[in-house]
UniProtKB/Swiss-Prot annotation:
GO MF annotations, alphabetized: ATP binding; hydroxyethylthiazole kinase activity; magnesium ion binding
Name this polypeptide is given: Hydroxyethylthiazole kinase
Presence of keyword Magnesium: yes
Sequence similarity: Belongs to the Thz kinase family.
Superkingdom of this protein's organism: Bacteria
Function (record text): Catalyzes the phosphorylation of the hydroxyl group of 4-methyl-5-beta-hydroxyethylthiazole (THZ).
Keyword set, alphabetical order: ATP-binding, Kinase, Magnesium, Metal-binding, Nucleotide-binding, Thiamine biosynthesis, Transferase
Species of origin: Bacillus cereus (strain AH187)
Length: 268
């Protein structure tokens, strides 16, 4: 897997304009929709249990994000996820804050038990808590801790029969057999709420057009990281507000050529 190979997926997303169904949290809904639109995908935010199964059945990908967790949304996620499975629509799960509370952790473990996942994406603490491995967490954005990130990712991929994506200073993608590290991105991403949640939805757009989910995830992470680097180069001295706006611009303007030029990936 090389930069030229993954760069082609960016063009495919823009040519295909995939429909990404998001059941996400109230903090990030607007940013997620705008980010997907900038990229070239078509977002839909449908939450009502009366319609989620139908909407999921016609989507290119379904993204389940449990950031602002409520029982009615969990019910909707399960209905949508099972419909997506029946209709061969890939499901992505973002277990935001898994490990922070007992209820949140219970839901984070219940959803993968009920729904076949194409991708699970979170920080190291979240993924570790989903698979019941010890990892300290403080708040929903905690990611630092003691442990081997690659090992946790591989264990999650094996136990959940999915592609595991752990994001942080370096990003890890694995299906348990193939493991790739991506080293693109910028620290200012942590100063804008919703950048991790948007990332999961961006991976959804890539998964909708590329059935090799490892390749799709690596392409999405590299694209996202390069876009962040280009945006930061123009705005980092101004601050996170300016960065957020420019990041949306770069999601629209970052090309496959930029991926080939700036992408930093390593197969391990």
């Amino acid at each position: 897997m090389n930069r030229k190979e993954i760069s082609k997926v960016v063009d495919l997303v823009r040519e295909s304009n995939p429909l990404v169904h998001n059941i996400t949290n109230v903090v990030v809904t607007n940013f997620t929709a705008n980010g997907l639109l900038a990229l070239g995908a078509s977002p839909v935010m449908a939450y009502a249990k009366e319609e989620v199964a139908e909407m999921a059945s016609i989507a290119g990908a379904l993204v389940l994000n449990m950031g602002t967790l409520r029982p009615e949304e969990v019910e909707a996620m399960l209905l949508a996820g099972k419909s997506a499975n029946v209709n061969n629509v890939p499901v992505l799960f973002d277990p935001v804050g898994a490990g922070a509370t007992s209820y949140r952790t219970e839901v984070a473990r219940h959803i993968p038990a009920e729904i076949e996942l194409a991708i699970i994406r979170g920080n190291a603490a979240e993924i570790a808590n989903v698979i019941n491995e010890r990892w300290e967490i403080k708040g929903v954005d905690a990611g630092a801790g003691n442990g081997n990130v690659v090992s946790i990712a591989k264990q999650a991929a094996d136990e959940l029969n999915t592609v595991a994506v752990i994001t942080g200073k370096e990003d890890v993608v694995t299906d348990g057999q193939r493991t790739i590290v991506i080293r693109n991105g910028h620290p200012i991403l942590t100063k804008v709420t919703g950048t991790g949640c948007l990332l999961t939805s961006v991976i959804g757009a890539f998964v909708a057009v590329e059935k090799d989910y490892v390749k799709a995830a690596v392409a999405a992470l590299t694209f996202y990281g390069v876009a962040a680097e280009l945006a930061a180069a123009k705005t980092v001295e101004k601050g996170p507000g300016s960065f957020q706006i420019e990041f949306l611009n770069q999601l629209a303007n970052t090309t496959s050529g930029d991926i080939e030029k700036y992408g930093e990936i390593e197969v391990i």
